[in-house]
Amino acid sequence: MRTVLIVEDSETCAETLQIALDSIPGLKTIVLASPGAALTALHKHGDDIVAVITDLHLPLHDGLELIRQLRADTRFRNLPVLLISGDSDPQLAHRALARGADAFFSKPYSPAAVRRKLEQLLC
């Protein structure tokens, strides 16, 4: 089954995304709280993972570092990555996209907008 990793240390934010995405037919979500856990899951189940949605501020490494590591690995270079942040820095979206994010959402965001963008990227 196609799987989306949600890398988010806030249970509330993760649950909101899960509810929005779990209604997509043929798609399941896995929530992980850190980039390290996400990389482990990708190396273990990489063939099933079709996208990553990550928060910017996470334990140990941030979402931009996770994107850097994914883009440096030939297996995950083209994996869609959506970045979510609570920061209001107007340059952050530009930096995220320049570093390889496929989309950027600022909190508060619309879960439906995240879902639409994910569906667009997976077509």
State each model region's role:
Residues 31-51:
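Acidic, metal-coordinating helix/loop segments flanking the phosphotransfer/catalytic sites
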Residues 109-118:
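C-terminal output helix
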Residues 8:
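Conserved acidic carboxylate
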Residues 59, 89:
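The feature encodes the CheY-like receiver
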